[in-house]
């Protein structure tokens, strides 16, 4: 090959790489490359798979892992990460020793938190168990095991020992969104992902993948026996294409449109309620509209003691809301990481499960976005400056290092909050 041709091909290849949306290159359009997950002949590079490293031993369904989740983590966890990294959703154990937080800061959270158990001694020994901090996926190759306490999904019957990434995400990405907004598993070909603010829209000849390749109506993993098919469709939502990042300076806004709580209810059916009034379950879902009063509180609340906020800059990713729309033009305009779209709630906005919880795991019990196990988010030093604390063996840090607490708040240092900041339930309720 002539030198000039080599240079031209190199430039062309580089241009293609730069133009390709890296966030969904492997799962482009939903489905991944078959050989990325499966091995046809128990071989890899001419060698028997089971003689390779343990996590790449062939598993059921010709997977390149012992379980579905292990196969996912072959790509979605990477030993040696030093910070939030692209599409990684789990931190290797060696990269999060005692006193060090899991590294990934995707909107869904880092599964590594479920391996973090904390103890502290205040009026006796207190414990925050790791398994209480998230969905306990089964991925033995990576030392993730089923929840030992909650043997079925809270509010439902989905078996904990069968909880895999594929319990929520359709690994073959069959669910697709058409130009009229409808969702189906067949029809037009899927031309690209539909998850991101820079995703191409569906057209008359091509659909786009459902949000985060989630399973929709009728979905049930083939490996799961019994009757667990989803009753509700995938939600309308859009994420920024760069989403795994610290929020120390600017926030990562996922634009939640509608249907998230309804989708969560596929497994957690009996703990959902979308209609007022109730004194048993916090309303969540398309019917749980803020109304003018709650929207006004959300928009005015900045921190404990400060209700001077305005709607134009009220959004907080530690307490996101659903916008009550499936208009993807609107949602794409709000999925940002540069704080140029911080518009707050209105009367038609609503609470959804992810207003309080993260989808994968978090640094706190019940996988909440903020700590509910102590009345204060911060305390104060002698000068009145906000701090998370200095001693892990206190109620403020609850066994965590300052580094871990900061990471649990996605890089936010304590001075982002008021001294003696109360729980962020007050973003909507303003009781402080």
UniProtKB/Swiss-Prot annotation:
Named cofactor requirement(s): heme
Compartments where found: Cell outer membrane; Cell surface
GO MF terms held by the record: electron transfer activity; metal ion binding
Primary subcellular site in the record, as a coarse category: membrane
One cellular component term from this protein's GO annotations in UniProt: cell outer membrane
InterPro entries per record: Cytochrome_c-type_ET, Multihaem_cyt_sf
Cofactor binding summary note: Binds 6 low-spin heme groups per subunit.
Keywords assigned by UniProt, alphabetized: Cell outer membrane, Electron transport, Heme, Iron, Membrane, Metal-binding, Signal, Transport
Reported consequences of knocking out the gene: Deletion of the gene inhibits Fe(3+) oxide reduction, but does not impact reduction of fumarate or Fe(3+) citrate. Deletion negatively impacts the expression of omcT.
Cystine pairs: none
Signal peptide coordinates: 1-25
Induction summary: Expressed in the presence of insoluble Fe(3+) oxide and during growth with fumarate as the sole electron acceptor, but not during growth on soluble Fe(3+) citrate. Induced in the cocultures with G.metallireducens.
Annotated GO biological process: anaerobic respiration
Gene3D superfamilies with a match to the protein in the record: Flavocytochrome C3, Chain A
Protein name: C-type cytochrome OmcS
Organism: Geobacter sulfurreducens (strain ATCC 51573 / DSM 12127 / PCA)
């Amino acid at each position: 090959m002539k030198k000039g041709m080599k240079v031209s091909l190199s430039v062309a290849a580089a241009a293609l790489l730069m133009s390709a949306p890296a966030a969904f290159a492997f799962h482009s359009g939903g489905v991944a490359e078959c050989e990325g997950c499966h091995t046809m002949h128990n071989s890899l590079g001419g060698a028997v798979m089971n003689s390779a490293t343990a996590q790449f031993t062939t598993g059921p369904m010709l997977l390149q892992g012992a379980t579905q989740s292990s196969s996912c983590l072959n790509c979605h966890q990477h030993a040696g990460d030093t910070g939030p990294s692209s599409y990684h959703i789990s931190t290797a154990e060696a990269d999060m020793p005692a006193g060090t937080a899991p590294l990934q800061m995707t909107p869904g959270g880092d599964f590594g938190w479920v391996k973090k158990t904390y103890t502290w001694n205040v009026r006796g020994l207190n414990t925050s168990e790791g398994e209480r901090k998230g969905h306990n996926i089964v991925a033995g190759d990576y030392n993730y095991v089923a929840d030992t306490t909650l043997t079925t999904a809270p509010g439902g019957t989905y078996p904990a020992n069968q909880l895999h990434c594929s319990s929520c995400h359709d690994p073959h990405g069959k669910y697709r969104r058409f130009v009229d907004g409808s969702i189906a598993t067949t029809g037009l070909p899927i031309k690209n992902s539909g998850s991101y603010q820079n995703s191409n829209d569906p057209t008359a000849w091509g659909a786009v993948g459902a949000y985060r390749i989630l399973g929709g109506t009728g979905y049930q993993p083939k490996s799961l026996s019994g009757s667990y098919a989803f009753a509700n469709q995938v939600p309308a939502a859009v994420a920024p294409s760069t989403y795994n990042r610290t929020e120390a300076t600017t926030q990562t806004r996922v634009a939640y449109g509608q249907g998230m709580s309804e989708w969560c209810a596929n497994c957690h059916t009996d703990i959902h309620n979308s209609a007022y009034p109730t004194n048993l379950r916090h309303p969540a879902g398309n019917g749980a509209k803020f109304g003018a009063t709650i929207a006004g509180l959300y928009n005015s609340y900045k921190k404990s003691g400060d209700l001077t906020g305005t709607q134009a800059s009220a959004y907080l990713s530690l307490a996101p809301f659903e916008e009550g729309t499936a208009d993807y033009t609107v949602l794409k305009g709000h999925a940002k990481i540069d704080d140029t779209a911080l518009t707050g709630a209105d009367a038609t906005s609503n609470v959804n499960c992810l207003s309080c919880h993260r989808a994968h795991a978090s640094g706190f019990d019940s996988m909440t976005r903020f700590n509910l196990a102590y009345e204060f988010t911060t305390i104060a030093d002698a000068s009145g400056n906000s701090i998370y604390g200095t001693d892990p063996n206190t109620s403020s840090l609850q066994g965590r290092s300052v580094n871990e607490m900061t990471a649990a708040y996605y890089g936010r240092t304590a001075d982002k909050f008021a001294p003696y900041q109360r729980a962020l339930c007050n973003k909507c309720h303003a009781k402080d």
